[in-house]
């Protein structure tokens, strides 16, 4: 009996890896480019397990969670658990987290250039009100903030800050395509202008605008969170306004139940934040085509082959 089980296991591995009985898997990825790299690594891992995956469709969180709850999509690995909580809650338990891409890896907040912060003694986001002209690039009488597009979890948090602190009286949130707007901000900084933006880590921006050298985090006096010790900030302790978040895979609950091998892979795979940031900087430097991203992912796997193979071997044990 034991020999029969071994034979069946070996055959199942062969069939899955050769695609003889490959299952289709519907995977999406985030519509922000800093999430493309780890999505591609996870895609390659799932394909190694025998899943057939079409080209990943870029979607915003609000669209992903609705689709996953309805079974139109199976999973993505671009979940920010705290940031996207409102969308996650709306699925009523039909879409759940599994594993961690980067536990505690998602840092978020508002930054301004260090020179302006020090010259005008700007410590808090409320201090921007006294210096609107420094950040008003379109001359509408309000400071311009690079914010989040509609449908992103961070947009809801930023909106809550605007409502609680009446930020709309003196700040205009720019909600156009994020990467392009942020690139414009980098150009403005290089031209000597003051800058003000929301961002998160890991992100290519930190390879361009250095924390503590070019830019600093600023305090957000919201009641929803408390001050924490901070480096490269306007004070030794600030309220970032956002939770330190976990980047996680989220999947349809029924899919996970019916696909234990995929579930196990999602549980044990992970990508260091430093590696994600390094790849994001390559994209900023121009290596941003889909072919580039696929190459980056394959190169990462080669450099971490033993670890990657271990994930695959462990996940395959759950095919039976």
Could you say what each language-model-derived stretch is?
Residues 23-34, 51-56, 142-146, 266:
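Short, well-ordered beta-strand elements
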Residues 32-33, 51-66, 173-184:
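Short helix-initiation/N-cap motifs at beta->coil->alpha
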Residues 33-52, 160-162:
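Short, polar/charged alpha-helical segment
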Residues 67, 73-77, 149-224:
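Ligand-binding pocket segment of bilobal, Venus flytrap-like solute-binding proteins
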Residues 86-99, 192, 206-236:
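Ligand-binding "clamshell"
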Residues 96-147:
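A conserved helix-loop-strand patch within extracytoplasmic ligand-binding domains
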Residues 108-118, 231-232, 246-258, 282:
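A bilobed periplasmic-binding-protein/Venus flytrap-type ligand-binding module shared by bacterial periplasmic
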Residues 242, 255-256, 263-320:
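C-terminal functional modules
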């Amino acid at each position: 009996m034991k020999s029969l089980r071994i034979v069946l296991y070996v055959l199942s591995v062969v069939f899955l890896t050769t695609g003889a009985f490959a299952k289709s898997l519907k995977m999406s990825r985030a519509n922000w480019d800093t999430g493309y790299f780890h999505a591609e690594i996870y895609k390659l891992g799932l394909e190694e397990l025998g899943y057939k995956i079409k080209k990943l469709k870029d979607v915003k969180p609000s669209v992903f969670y609705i689709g996953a709850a309805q079974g139109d999509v199976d999973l993505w690995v671009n979940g920010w658990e705290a940031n996207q909580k409102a969308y996650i809650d709306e699925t009523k338990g039909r879409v759940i987290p599994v594993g961690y891409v980067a536990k505690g890896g998602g840092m978020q907040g508002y930054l301004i250039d260090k020179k302006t912060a020090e010259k005008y003694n700007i410590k808090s986001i409320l201090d921007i009100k006294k210096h609107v002209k420094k950040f008003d690039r379109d001359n509408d009488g309000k400071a311009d903030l690079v914010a989040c597009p509609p449908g992103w979890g961070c947009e809801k948090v930023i909106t809550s800050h605007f409502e609680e602190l009446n930020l709309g009286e003196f700040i205009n949130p720019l909600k156009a395509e994020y990467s392009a707007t942020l690139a414009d901000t980098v150009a403005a900084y290089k031209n000597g202008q003051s800058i003000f933006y929301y961002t998160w880590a890991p992100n290519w921006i930190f390879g361009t605008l250095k924390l503590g050298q070019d830019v600093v985090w600023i305090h957000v006096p919201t009641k929803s969170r408390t001050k924490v010790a901070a480096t490269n900030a306007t004070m030794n302790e600030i309220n970032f306004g956002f939770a330190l978040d976990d980047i996680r895979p989220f999947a349809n609950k029924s899919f996970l139940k019916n696909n234990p091998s995929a579930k196990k892979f999602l549980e044990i795979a992970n990508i260091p934040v430093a590696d994600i940031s390094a790849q994001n900087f390559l994209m900023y430097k121009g290596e941003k085509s889909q072919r580039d991203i696929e190459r980056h992912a394959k190169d990462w796997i080669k450099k971490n082959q033993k670890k990657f193979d271990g994930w695959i071997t462990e996940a395959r044990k759950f095919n039976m």
